[in-house]
């Protein structure tokens, strides 16, 4: 408590500590320090217990802002051995899944941006600026299987630095624009049977957006925004991160690339760029790391380059004839 809670939260009155402020504190703490998940869980327990006592026992405040607090829904970088993908492995995976357009495009997106799993799976077409060749990373997706109102939710990125722009390399640009064409074609084919999703915004007491529930069209969506989700099944069905489950069983068992995760594409992206002369500050910005130390702890340092060249450097190293063939798409009428 003395090391983390008092220095950051002790300067506020209890009544001034909202759920949003406590959540920001937790995600920033997780981003800054490279401890195991169990360690952060202990900090969270102390925080929740303190506010429960302040509310229920002592009556210092009427509302408990820590009641629904939880750790960020992200992969635990510390507890897993990282896998550094090489070009042969990437080519093998893309060759095996060349007929699975959704997984292939999601894989290439993570491979060429270093985005977190939840950030990739939360992408909407509104986030992708094809004119300026930029991806606007603004949110992440997580599930609440026991919620009963809708499993998948869209929330803010891990930290404020998680909100960022990533320039698309030529390879990624072509992959995404062709995938969008295919999705539009499938919408026409399925017609009224194509599944459409909407965002049901959940607003806090302070009037600020907490998160958005992703719901299927149920006829009661007049005042909701269309989700325009990128990575959906051919019929429009959205399954969040589960889009990756079956392919990775094949990758582990059939292809023999064991102990690798979708998330490891993030580390592979960073390490490949750093080894090829990209400045670590630029890589940290692309990854959404607030502190360079976070990048240094997981990846290999290197020398200077321009931030916008990060995507181009990776493109030159990793793009093969196979990838170029896979991202080509022509609608078959």
Where are these regions (language model features)?
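Short, charged phosphate-coordinating catalytic segments
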Residues: 52-65, 90, 108-141, 281
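C-terminal secondary-structure termini that scaffold catalytic or DNA-interacting sites
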Residues: 132, 143-145, 149-163, 170-172, ...
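DNA breakage-rejoining catalytic core of tyrosine-based enzymes
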Residues: 15, 61-63, 73-95, 136-138, ...
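Short, polar N-cap/turn motifs at the start of nucleic acid-interacting alpha helices
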Residues: 127-134, 258, 278-298, 308, ...
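Catalytic-site neighborhood detector that most strongly recognizes the C-terminal catalytic loop/helix
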Residues: 76, 84, 141, 287-312
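C-terminal catalytic core of tyrosine-transesterase DNA break-rejoin enzymes
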Residues: 56, 108, 112-119, 242-243, ...
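Active-site/catalytic core of tyrosine-dependent DNA strand-transfer enzymes
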Residues: 169-257
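N-terminal core-binding DNA-recognition domain of tyrosine site-specific recombinases/integrases
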Residues: 1-53, 57-59, 79, 237-243, ...
């Amino acid at each position: 408590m003395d090391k983390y809670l008092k220095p950051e939260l002790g300067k506020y009155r209890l009544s001034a500590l909202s759920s949003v402020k406590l959540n920001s504190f937790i995600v920033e703490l997780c981003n800054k320090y490279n401890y195991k998940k169990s360690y952060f869980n202990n900090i969270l327990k102390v925080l929740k217990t303190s506010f429960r006592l302040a509310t229920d026992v002592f009556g210092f405040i009427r509302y408990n802002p820590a009641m629904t607090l939880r750790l960020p829904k992200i992969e635990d970088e510390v507890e897993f051995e990282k896998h550094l993908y090489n070009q042969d492995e990437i080519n093998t995976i893309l060759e095996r899944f060349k007929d699975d357009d959704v997984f292939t495009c999601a894989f290439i997106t993570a491979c060429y941006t270093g985005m977190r799993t939840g950030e990739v799976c939360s992408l909407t077409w509104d986030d992708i600026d094809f004119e300026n060749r930029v991806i606007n990373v603004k949110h992440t997706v997580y599930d609440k299987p026991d919620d009963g109102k809708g499993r998948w939710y869209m929330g803010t990125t891990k930290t404020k630095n998680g909100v960022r722009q990533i320039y698309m390399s030529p390879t990624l640009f072509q992959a995404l624009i062709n995938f969008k064409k295919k999705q539009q074609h499938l919408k026409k084919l399925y017609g009224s049977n194509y599944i459409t999703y909407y965002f049901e915004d959940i607003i806090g007491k302070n009037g600020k957006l907490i998160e958005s529930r992703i719901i299927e069209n149920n006829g009661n969506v007049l005042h909701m925004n269309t989700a325009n989700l990128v990575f959906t099944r051919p019929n429009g069905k959205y399954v969040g991160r589960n889009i990756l489950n079956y392919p990775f069983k094949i990758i582990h068992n059939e292809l023999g690339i064991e102990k690798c995760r979708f998330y490891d594409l993030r580390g592979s992206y960073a390490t490949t760029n750093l080894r090829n002369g990209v400045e670590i500050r630029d890589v940290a910005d692309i990854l959404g790391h607030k502190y360079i130390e976070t990048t240094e702890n997981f990846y290999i340092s290197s020398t200077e380059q321009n931030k916008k060249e990060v995507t181009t450097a990776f493109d030159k190293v990793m793009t093969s004839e196979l990838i170029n063939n896979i991202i080509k798409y022509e609608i078959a009428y």
